[in-house]
Amino acid sequence: KLVCNHTGSNMLDGVAAAFVLAAKNNGKLDADYASIEIDEASTVRVFPHFKPDYMVLTNLFRDQLDRYGEIDITMKLLDRAMKMAPKMKVIVNGDDALSAYLAMESGNVYVTYGIPGQVFDQKETGEIREGRFCKRCGERLSYDFYHYSQLGSYHCPKCGFARPEADFAAEAIDMTHGLKFEIREKQGRVTPVEVNYQGFYNIYNILAAYSAARTGG
Protein backbone atom coordinates (compact mmCIF):
# COMPACT_ATOMS: atom_id res chain seq x y z
CA LYS A 1 0.00 0.00 0.00
CA LEU A 2 1.17 3.50 -0.86
CA VAL A 3 0.82 6.93 0.72
CA CYS A 4 0.91 9.74 -1.85
CA ASN A 5 0.08 13.45 -1.81
CA HIS A 6 -1.78 13.10 -5.09
CA THR A 7 -3.64 16.39 -4.61
CA GLY A 8 -0.41 18.27 -5.28
CA SER A 9 -0.09 19.82 -1.81
CA ASN A 10 3.67 19.56 -1.47
CA MET A 11 4.51 21.82 1.47
CA LEU A 12 4.71 20.70 5.11
CA ASP A 13 0.95 20.89 5.76
CA GLY A 14 0.14 19.00 2.57
CA VAL A 15 2.69 16.29 3.29
CA ALA A 16 1.34 15.86 6.83
CA ALA A 17 -2.23 15.76 5.50
CA ALA A 18 -1.34 12.95 3.10
CA PHE A 19 -0.30 10.74 6.02
CA VAL A 20 -3.31 11.75 8.12
CA LEU A 21 -5.74 10.92 5.31
CA ALA A 22 -4.07 7.54 4.80
CA ALA A 23 -4.36 6.61 8.48
CA LYS A 24 -7.10 4.43 9.92
CA ASN A 25 -9.61 5.63 12.52
CA ASN A 26 -7.32 4.39 15.27
CA GLY A 27 -4.55 6.64 13.97
CA LYS A 28 -2.36 3.81 12.70
CA LEU A 29 -0.91 3.99 9.22
CA ASP A 30 -1.48 0.90 7.09
CA ALA A 31 1.03 1.45 4.29
CA ASP A 32 4.17 -0.13 2.90
CA TYR A 33 5.62 2.88 1.07
CA ALA A 34 5.22 6.63 0.75
CA SER A 35 5.88 8.50 -2.49
CA ILE A 36 5.78 12.19 -1.64
CA GLU A 37 6.38 15.27 -3.77
CA ILE A 38 7.99 17.96 -1.63
CA ASP A 39 8.43 21.62 -2.51
CA GLU A 40 12.12 22.52 -2.63
CA ALA A 41 11.95 25.00 0.26
CA SER A 42 9.83 22.63 2.33
CA THR A 43 12.42 19.85 2.35
CA VAL A 44 14.24 21.51 5.26
CA ARG A 45 10.93 21.65 7.19
CA VAL A 46 9.81 18.11 6.35
CA PHE A 47 13.07 16.19 6.79
CA PRO A 48 13.37 16.86 10.56
CA HIS A 49 10.15 14.85 10.99
CA PHE A 50 11.07 11.86 8.81
CA LYS A 51 14.13 10.79 6.88
CA PRO A 52 13.37 9.47 3.39
CA ASP A 53 15.21 6.40 2.16
CA TYR A 54 15.37 7.87 -1.36
CA MET A 55 15.06 11.28 -2.98
CA VAL A 56 14.49 11.88 -6.69
CA LEU A 57 16.13 15.11 -7.86
CA THR A 58 14.79 15.95 -11.32
CA ASN A 59 16.11 19.38 -12.31
CA LEU A 60 16.59 22.98 -11.20
CA PHE A 61 14.82 25.29 -13.62
CA ARG A 62 13.77 28.92 -13.61
CA ASP A 63 10.22 28.05 -12.52
CA GLN A 64 11.54 28.09 -8.96
CA LEU A 65 12.73 31.69 -9.22
CA ASP A 66 9.33 33.30 -8.68
CA ARG A 67 9.33 31.79 -5.18
CA TYR A 68 12.98 31.77 -4.13
CA GLY A 69 14.62 34.52 -6.18
CA GLU A 70 17.81 32.71 -7.15
CA ILE A 71 18.68 29.16 -8.12
CA ASP A 72 21.52 29.33 -5.59
CA ILE A 73 18.97 29.74 -2.78
CA THR A 74 17.10 26.64 -3.95
CA MET A 75 20.36 24.70 -4.14
CA LYS A 76 21.34 25.71 -0.61
CA LEU A 77 17.96 24.59 0.73
CA LEU A 78 18.26 21.21 -0.97
CA ASP A 79 21.85 20.83 0.23
CA ARG A 80 20.73 21.47 3.82
CA ALA A 81 17.96 18.92 3.45
CA MET A 82 20.29 16.24 2.09
CA LYS A 83 22.66 16.77 5.00
CA MET A 84 19.73 16.09 7.35
CA ALA A 85 19.36 12.62 5.83
CA PRO A 86 22.90 11.30 5.27
CA LYS A 87 21.70 7.71 4.74
CA MET A 88 19.25 8.75 2.03
CA LYS A 89 20.11 7.63 -1.51
CA VAL A 90 19.70 10.32 -4.18
CA ILE A 91 18.38 9.48 -7.64
CA VAL A 92 19.45 12.40 -9.81
CA ASN A 93 19.06 13.60 -13.38
CA GLY A 94 22.69 13.62 -14.47
CA ASP A 95 21.87 15.68 -17.57
CA ASP A 96 21.29 18.71 -15.32
CA ALA A 97 24.64 20.14 -14.21
CA LEU A 98 23.10 21.82 -11.16
CA SER A 99 21.32 18.73 -9.87
CA ALA A 100 24.33 16.52 -10.60
CA TYR A 101 26.63 18.89 -8.72
CA LEU A 102 24.31 18.86 -5.71
CA ALA A 103 24.27 15.07 -5.60
CA MET A 104 28.03 14.75 -6.09
CA GLU A 105 28.85 17.22 -3.33
CA SER A 106 26.18 16.06 -0.87
CA GLY A 107 28.06 13.10 0.57
CA ASN A 108 24.99 10.93 -0.02
CA VAL A 109 25.13 7.80 -2.13
CA TYR A 110 23.60 8.64 -5.50
CA VAL A 111 22.62 7.05 -8.80
CA THR A 112 22.01 8.87 -12.06
CA TYR A 113 19.59 8.73 -14.96
CA GLY A 114 19.73 10.55 -18.27
CA ILE A 115 19.58 10.59 -22.04
CA PRO A 116 23.17 10.13 -23.24
CA GLY A 117 22.66 10.51 -26.99
CA GLN A 118 21.87 13.64 -28.96
CA VAL A 119 18.19 13.74 -29.95
CA PHE A 120 17.83 17.29 -31.29
CA ASP A 121 20.16 19.38 -33.43
CA GLN A 122 20.77 21.88 -30.65
CA LYS A 123 24.38 22.68 -29.91
CA GLU A 124 24.00 26.42 -29.44
CA THR A 125 21.02 28.60 -28.57
CA GLY A 126 20.18 32.04 -27.27
CA GLU A 127 17.77 30.62 -24.71
CA ILE A 128 18.42 31.77 -21.16
CA ARG A 129 19.84 28.85 -19.22
CA GLU A 130 20.67 28.19 -15.61
CA GLY A 131 23.94 26.57 -14.71
CA ARG A 132 26.05 28.04 -17.49
CA PHE A 133 29.01 28.10 -15.16
CA CYS A 134 30.65 25.28 -13.27
CA LYS A 135 29.53 25.25 -9.63
CA ARG A 136 32.82 23.68 -8.64
CA CYS A 137 35.28 26.21 -10.10
CA GLY A 138 33.27 28.98 -11.81
CA GLU A 139 34.48 28.29 -15.37
CA ARG A 140 31.91 28.45 -18.17
CA LEU A 141 30.64 24.95 -18.95
CA SER A 142 31.13 23.54 -22.43
CA TYR A 143 28.19 21.65 -23.98
CA ASP A 144 28.42 19.04 -26.72
CA PHE A 145 24.64 19.38 -27.16
CA TYR A 146 21.47 20.38 -25.36
CA HIS A 147 18.22 18.47 -24.98
CA TYR A 148 16.36 21.51 -23.65
CA SER A 149 17.07 24.29 -21.17
CA GLN A 150 20.38 23.34 -19.51
CA LEU A 151 19.84 19.59 -19.84
CA GLY A 152 22.43 17.98 -22.06
CA SER A 153 26.02 16.79 -22.35
CA TYR A 154 28.33 19.17 -20.47
CA HIS A 155 31.82 19.33 -19.07
CA CYS A 156 34.06 21.89 -17.45
CA PRO A 157 37.25 22.53 -19.44
CA LYS A 158 39.04 23.73 -16.29
CA CYS A 159 38.34 21.36 -13.39
CA GLY A 160 36.95 18.30 -15.20
CA PHE A 161 33.46 18.37 -13.70
CA ALA A 162 31.26 16.61 -16.26
CA ARG A 163 27.98 14.86 -16.86
CA PRO A 164 28.23 11.49 -15.12
CA GLU A 165 27.66 8.24 -16.96
CA ALA A 166 24.01 7.35 -16.48
CA ASP A 167 23.15 4.32 -14.35
CA PHE A 168 19.78 4.35 -16.15
CA ALA A 169 19.91 5.62 -19.74
CA ALA A 170 17.13 6.21 -22.27
CA GLU A 171 18.21 5.07 -25.75
CA ALA A 172 16.69 4.32 -29.17
CA ILE A 173 14.16 7.13 -28.74
CA ASP A 174 11.23 7.28 -31.19
CA MET A 175 8.63 10.04 -30.76
CA THR A 176 6.68 9.38 -33.97
CA HIS A 177 3.62 7.98 -32.21
CA GLY A 178 3.71 8.64 -28.49
CA LEU A 179 7.01 7.73 -26.85
CA LYS A 180 9.00 4.60 -27.54
CA PHE A 181 12.47 3.98 -26.13
CA GLU A 182 14.68 1.60 -24.18
CA ILE A 183 16.05 2.00 -20.68
CA ARG A 184 19.53 0.54 -20.44
CA GLU A 185 20.94 -0.07 -16.98
CA LYS A 186 24.67 0.13 -16.39
CA GLN A 187 24.89 -3.58 -15.60
CA GLY A 188 23.31 -4.42 -18.97
CA ARG A 189 19.59 -4.93 -18.38
CA VAL A 190 17.44 -3.38 -21.13
CA THR A 191 13.74 -2.58 -20.63
CA PRO A 192 11.57 -1.48 -23.59
CA VAL A 193 9.11 1.35 -22.92
CA GLU A 194 6.16 2.34 -25.10
CA VAL A 195 3.52 4.83 -23.92
CA ASN A 196 0.93 7.10 -25.53
CA TYR A 197 2.29 10.20 -23.80
CA GLN A 198 3.60 13.12 -25.81
CA GLY A 199 6.46 15.42 -24.87
CA PHE A 200 10.18 14.79 -24.63
CA TYR A 201 10.14 15.78 -20.94
CA ASN A 202 8.02 12.71 -20.22
CA ILE A 203 11.01 10.53 -21.09
CA TYR A 204 12.74 12.10 -18.09
CA ASN A 205 9.64 11.57 -15.93
CA ILE A 206 9.47 7.89 -16.85
CA LEU A 207 13.23 7.51 -16.37
CA ALA A 208 13.01 9.06 -12.91
CA ALA A 209 10.17 6.77 -11.84
CA TYR A 210 11.86 3.67 -13.27
CA SER A 211 15.21 4.55 -11.67
CA ALA A 212 13.58 5.08 -8.29
CA ALA A 213 11.66 1.80 -8.49
CA ARG A 214 14.72 -0.20 -9.53
CA THR A 215 16.98 1.46 -6.97
CA GLY A 216 14.45 0.88 -4.22
CA GLY A 217 14.10 -2.77 -5.19
Model-derived features with residue positions:
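Phosphate-binding loop of NTP-binding sites
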Residues: 1-116, 122-133
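Adenine nucleotide phosphate-binding catalytic loops in nucleotide-utilizing enzymes
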Residues: 114-217
